[in-house]
């Protein structure tokens, strides 16, 4: 049976297989490059009711390529449509209803979905020509299809996992927000940037004097992290030397800091009202019993607050009303977790279940605040 879709007849046949949904994988021009810098080479589609997947070439040297817009119209007929990484998919097709299978897995299993390596042919091409921008255009379609089939066979069992509580928040809102943020990147002075950060290959994620990153939503807590090509925006040193590698837009760097973000979230959940002034300063007044707070006392108050947020309430302050409320909140949350087997984050709706290992009240509080 054919597996390469190249003719109108084959496209129509494949469309008739879409009524039960399917799984899609994008073959970009080079897996090493940031998705913003790639083109769509092929699409792998595996109808749910089929015992094999199909490759649709869009800009491959070996195939009778199909117009990308026609492929897009075809893909919209598959419902439900699963994919390994929805955010990556959006760089190629605006399929907002797609279901991120890696996200389904991570929210059910509190771990990252592991994907098998490619075949020996693909590995040889990447070891030999990994910097070539359109590398996947040169790899035989049969080998690309073989890799996609291998990946699908390893993950198909997880399509039956239940859609977890809070999934829509991450699959739709969070995915789209970080998809947009990623495309902005950070302005750089190219040579100082390369000298200081030493990326494996700067071409993998730089364009127009901007460096790009990729956000990961597949952590156990679902707190986003970012990294691409050895660059982590959250770990850039705050030194003047390192700042010289970055170029501000419109001549200015603007720094924002949400005052007591996690503390304010917690106070909202326990019903403790905070005023508009600094949250840390308000609580410092309680700790030290006075209105005027020194810089040293403010720093001490921040340390106390961070400890309390993650369930470590100082003994000398545990009788203050706010800490009584926090302790009650922790106790009730832990009781529900032990008795019901789960608790849900009030912001996102994500559930944390007893599948999490080595859980304790302080760790559970940490997960809830992330």
For each of these PLM feature ranges, what is it?
Residues 2-4, 18-19, 29-41, 45-50, ...:
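Acidic, glycine-rich two-metal-ion catalytic cores of nucleic acid-processing enzymes
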Residues 12-14:
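RNase H-like, metal-dependent ribonuclease domains
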Residues 90-165, 174-184, 229-360:
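Helical catalytic core of nucleic-acid polymerases
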Residues 98, 172-173, 188-193:
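Non-catalytic nucleic-acid-binding/docking modules located in mid-to-C-terminal regions
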Residues 2-8, 18-24, 28-162, 260:
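Conserved DEDDh/DEDDy metal-dependent 3′-5′ exonuclease domain
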